[in-house]
A protein has these predicted regions:
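Feature captures the catalytic ectodomains and active-site-proximal regions of enzymes
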Residues: 1-405
Length: 405
C-alpha cells in the first residue's frame, strides 16, 4: 500500500461574486479531486485547535498527525532547521520577511504593501539578506538567508515573549500599531527601521523599481519560537515517509519528523511553481522505497494572500492534473494499491487575503474499494453536506494510515 497526502495550502475559500458565488474549488476543473471525493470518505475538519492562530505551521503539524497543543513551538525554528541553522536550547528563531512598505519619511507612517516584495527571486532575496547580515549581525542577533522573501533571525541567549504580527495579516494597512512589542519589541523595531535605511538605495531595489517591480525595502519579523522535539513519523505511524515541498517551513517539519526531504528543481513556493516537477518527484520517492509521500503546494495560499482569484483556480487545476492525477494514473497503471488524503491545511479566503479559522474539506480515499460518506464533487459545500466532521484534525493521519475510515 502506498499513501499520498495531497495538501493544497490555503486551498479552501468562501463564495466569490466574480465566480458566480462559487469558491475556487467549486469553479476549478479538477476531475481527480472529484473522483476521490465520490469514491472516498469526504467531510470537514479543523486542523488548527481552537484558540490557536490559523497558521500553516500549526495546521501542517496537525495534518502530519501531531497535536499542535502538545508539539507546537513556533514557526521560525522549523524554517531555521531547513536552512541548516543550528539552534541552541536558549536560542529564539524569528521569521524575517523582506517585503514592501510604502515610502513615507517616518517609518511608523508606512503601510504594508506586499508581504513578499513581488515574490522576489531566491537570488535577489539571498543577496539582500546577506548584505544586511554583513552590516547588522551582532553576537546577539544573527540574520540567515532562506529563499525568496522568507528568511530567519536568531536571537541568542534569549527568551520568548515578543508580540509579533504576521505581515500577510495586514496587507494594505498601516503598520504603526503592528510593530514588535514586548520583550524584544524595541530591539526588533530598531532593526527593521535600520534595515529600511540600508535597503532603500540598494542596486537590486533600484533595478526592481525601474522594472516596475515592488522593492524589498524593509525587514519584518514574526513567528518566534524554539526548536521543537518531535517523535519521528516512522516511529509514530510505522511507515517511511517523504515530503515534497518548496518552502522552508515544510522542509523543516520534514527534517524534524525524520522524513526524507528531497530537492525539487523548479519548485519555488510561488503562485506559479513547477507543479509537474513535484508530481514526478513524488512518484520517484515512492519508487525509492518510501511508503508515504506528503506533497505540499503553496500556490493556492499565495494566490489567496494576493487576492488573485484566477491564479487560485489555476493552481487548484494544476495540482489536480500534474500532481494528484499524475500519481493516481501511474499507481493505477501498475496495479498498485494506494490511499489518498486530500485537503488544505486552512482556508485563505480571497475576500480577506489572510488565513481563516473555518473548517476545511477533506477526503480519505482507498483505491481498493469505495468508502462513505462520499460527495459528488470535492468542495466546501459538498463536504459539509455529508455530515462527517472531525473536530481534532491531527487524528486524521492515524485513520488514514490504518485505513480506519
Amino acid at each position: 500500500m502506498k499513501y499520498v497526502v495531497m495538501l493544497g495550502d490555503g486551498m479552501a475559500d468562501r463564495p466569490i461574486p466574480s465566480l458566480g458565488n462559487r469558491t475556487p474549488l467549486q469553479a476549478a476543473y479538477k476531475p481527480y479531486m472529484d473522483y476521490v471525493a465520490a469514491h472516498g470518505a469526504c467531510g470537514m475538519t479543523h486542523m488548527v485547535p481552537k484558540g490557536m492562530p490559523p497558521q500553516s505551521d500549526t495546521a501542517n503539524l496537525a495534518v502530519m498527525g501531531y497535536d499542535p497543543k502538545v508539539y507546537y513551538r513556533g514557526r521560525s525554528p522549523l524554517e531555521a532547521v531547513s536552512m541548516g541553522v543550528e539552534l541552541a536550547p536558549t536560542d529564539i528563531a524569528i521569521r524575517c520577511n523582506i517585503l514592501t512598505l510604502s515610502d513615507e519619511p517616518d517609518y511608523l507612517d508606512r503601510t504594508m504593501i506586499d508581504y513578499s516584495a513581488g515574490e522576489i527571486s531566491n537570488e535577489e532575496g539571498k543577496a539582500l539578506v546577506e548584505y544586511l547580515a554583513e552590516r547588522m549581525n551582532t553576537e546577539q542577533l544573527e540574520l540567515h538567508a532562506g529563499i525568496s522573501y522568507r528568511h530567519c533571525l536568531v536571537i541568542h541567549n534569549a527568551e520568548l515573549g515578543t508580540d509579533l504580527t504576521p505581515p500577510h495579516d495586514i496587507t494594505g494597512k498601516p503598520i504603526r500599531n503592528c510593530m514588535p512589542a514586548g520583550r524584544y519589541g524595541q530591539l526588533l523595531s530598531d532593526f527593521m527601521v535600520r534595515s529600511s535605511e540600508l535597503l532603500r538605495d540598494h542596486p537590486i531595489n533600484r533595478r526592481r523599481i525601474a522594472e516596475g517591480k515592488n522593492p524589498a525595502n524593509s525587514c519584518w519579523f514574526w513567528g518566534e519560537g524554539t526548536r521543537p522535539e518531535l517523535v519521528p513519523f516512522q516511529e509514530l505511524y510505522g511507515v517511511k515517509a517523504g515530503v515534497i515541498c518548496a518552502v522552508d517551513l515544510l522542509k523543516g517539519l520534514g527534517i524534524c519528523t525524520g522524513m526524507d526531504v528531497p530537492f525539487v528543481p523548479g519548485a519555488t513556493g510561488a503562485k506559479r511553481t513547477d507543479f509537474a516537477a513535484k508530481g514526478k518527484k513524488a512518484l520517484e520517492i515512492l519508487d525509492s522505497g518510501l511508503d508515504l509521500v506528503y506533497v505540499h503546494v503553496e500556490a493556492p495560499d499565495e494566490s489567496g494572500h494576493a487576492g488573485d482569484v484566477e491564479c487560485k483556480v489555476e493552481a487548484i487545476e494544476n495540482i489536480d492534473r500534474h500532481i494528484l492525477g499524475y500519481l493516481m494514473d501511474n499507481l493505477k497503471a501498475r496495479g498498485e494499491d494506494f490511499a489518498v488524503m486530500l485537503l488544505p491545511d486552512h482556508p485563505t479566503p480571497i475576500e480577506i487575503r489572510t488565513h481563516s479559522s473555518d473548517p476545511v474539506p477533506f477526503v480519505l480515499y482507498d483505491s481498493r474499494r469505495k468508502r462513505a460518506p462520499s460527495a459528488p464533487s470535492y468542495c466546501e459545500a459538498e463536504a459539509e453536506k455529508t455530515g462527517l466532521f472531525i473536530e481534532k484534525g491531527h487524528t486524521l493521519m492515524k485513520k488514514f494510515i490504518s485505513l480506519d475510515f
